[in-house]
Amino acid sequence: TLNSYIVKGDKTAIIDGVIGWDGVSDTLYEHLEKNDIDPKAIDYLIVNHMEPDHSGWIKDFKNINDDFTIICTDKAAKLVHSFYDDDIDIRVVKEGDKLDLGNGKVLSFYPVPNVHWPDTMLTYEEESKVLFSCDMYGAFGMIKDHYFDDELTEEEVQLFEDEGIRYYSN
């Protein structure tokens, strides 16, 4: 996904951030404003992984709101500290840990390292039964006119696997 999500109880969380360039973060702030959400009132950033297309805006966000907590895995916490100031408030979560936002909104967290990125985790909102799957099921593009992997030739499967290995080895 390239989307960010808001979960609002008594407290407010953004799940998955955005890139920090090309005006994308401005678009996020515009959408927050349209939904009557003040960026200064956001309590939590749920960082499902630190890939730059989801975390590149954290520094910019910190200039707007310096009173929030990042929720992430231990691997992501190390990356947050290496990319940004050490004074960012971080809560490290493990499998099954919960964050109660109030008003029936409870998030639970499930690390799935290396499914997409070394620090990947999934976030589940219990009341609505929505799984925020990060980039776990995401894919960009397709090979020729094939939408499903059972339509691929052996050569196309090999190309897909080679590209996956190239991606992870970088």
Tell me what each language-model feature is:
Residues 22, 50-55, 78-79, 116-117, ...:
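Active-site environment of divalent metal-dependent phosphoester hydrolases
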Residues 72-170:
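Metallo-beta-lactamase
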Residues 9-11, 42, 66-67, 86-88, ...:
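Short coil/turn connectors at secondary-structure junctions
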Residues 1-35, 122-133:
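Conserved beta-strand hairpin/beta-sheet module of binuclear metal-dependent hydrolase folds
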Residues 24-71:
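Active-site metal-binding motif and surrounding structural segment of the metallo-beta-lactamase
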